[in-house]
Amino acid sequence: MGSIDDSFSLPAPSDEHGFEALGTQLVEAMSTYAKCLKAENLPPPSLYPMFSASTSVACPEGIEAKRKIVELSQLICAATMDPELNLLISSLQFHFCSSLKVAIDLRIYEYIPVDGTVSLSQLAELAGRIMRVLTNKHVFMQIQPGHYAHTRMSSLLLKTKAKDLLSHRLDDVFRSASREADALAQAGYREPDRRAAKGFNLAFNTDKNFWEYIATDDPKRGARFARAMHAVNINSLDVIPRLYPFDSLATDGSLIVDVGGGQGQVAKRILEYYPNSGLRCIVQDGYVTNGSTAGPAAVEMHRHDFFEAQPIKGAAAYFFRHIFHDWPDNACVTILKQTARAMDKHRSRILICDQVLDDNSPAEASLLYDIDMMSLFGGKERSLAEWKSLIYSAGENLEIVNVLRSPESEAAILDVRLKL
């Protein structure tokens, strides 16, 4: 671990970050956001489930204002709260996670009508204690003492995909995270590598990585994980075809190899979005059977381990969605090397669809996803500087020539080519 530079000192508080100035900035951001919502005929933010579960503005000003509201609110709370109490409450947040898991396991959300309330007497005594924690976090609301109703958050639990994602996080990830500190200590507090034990290994008492474990030891857990991934909003299927002009690949041979592409859901969406482009897609995954899918957006399915030599040479694009963030740097270098050796230097590119963390103010969700990846896989979310360092360390004459970012999130596609 590096030594502390004694010459470093915190900057003096400025008027811009003064307490009242923060409040002024918050009011301004709320005003801007409200105007954008009104202009797009969207309802104002509310906890009530009758409003849209997701209030997403399209205009850049509204997106930025929404980000500022959340960021400033958290900053004001952190500055206002007693620091000892703040640390204490923060250290107890795992109880919220366990309470939420109990509510999901008991399916409490099914007993509450969407447009009504349920009394505590209709719930188990234990559930009442759990509900106190969850209403404090506005997952549910207490209309009057002992009577509970849905909020926009709890109403999401009525949707299977959201429930599966939360169940995965509150079980697989929660258990893994509880042992991550032990795993890091065991590794001497070094960056995880492919061979080091992760929090997952200690929590589940296995030498297998997560992927091997859910494929062989616990396929039921693996099926839930697959369902959960359909509920992830970062790099959603609808965003991907709009992030990159895939139809332009027609001039470079038209072939897209979707590496680690699961059942081909991304490849199919790309073909559906560009129906007359002449594109072809081959989906490679370690757990598929060789063959082809049916329908107008048909893709070829090939079994392949991306740590082995890439058998398809000179494709227009080797596409990786949510692959690199699952693996530590040394594993990613192996994947990049195997892919680069199959590329044609004039027409091939590697397209990496993952998060690119903002250097100055990364989203809180992205920072937590980073620890998520570390606990389960030893992976990480990366800033642009970290992506550049990773690509450079792979050698093979690779370089990032473009980064196409989503205006709505930290999702992005990195366009990586061979230097000419």
Curated annotation (Swiss-Prot):
Q: What organism is this sequence from?
A: Penicillium thymicola
Q: Which residue positions are annotated as catalytic?
A: 325
Keywords in alphabetical order: Methyltransferase, S-adenosyl-L-methionine, Transferase
**Protein's name according to its UniProt entry:** O-methyltransferase penK
Q: Which PANTHER family match?
A: O-METHYLTRANSFERASE ASQN-RELATED (PTHR43712:SF5), PUTATIVE (AFU_ORTHOLOGUE AFUA_4G14580)-RELATED (PTHR43712)
Sum up the protein's function in the record's words. Answer: O-methyltransferase; part of the gene cluster that mediates the biosynthesis of penigequinolones, potent insecticidal alkaloids that contain a highly modified 10-carbon prenyl group. The first stage is catalyzed by the nonribosomal peptide synthetase penN that condenses anthranilic acid and O-methyl-L-tyrosine to produce 4'-methoxycyclopeptin. 4'-methoxycyclopeptin is then converted to 4'-methoxydehydrocyclopeptin by the ketoglutarate-dependent dioxygenase penM through dehydrogenation to form a double bond between C-alpha and C-beta of the O-methyltyrosine side chain.
Enzyme Commission number(s) from the entry: 2.1.1.-
The cysteines covalently paired via disulfide bonds are none
Superkingdom to which the source organism belongs: Eukaryota
Q: Does the record carry Signal as a key word?
A: no
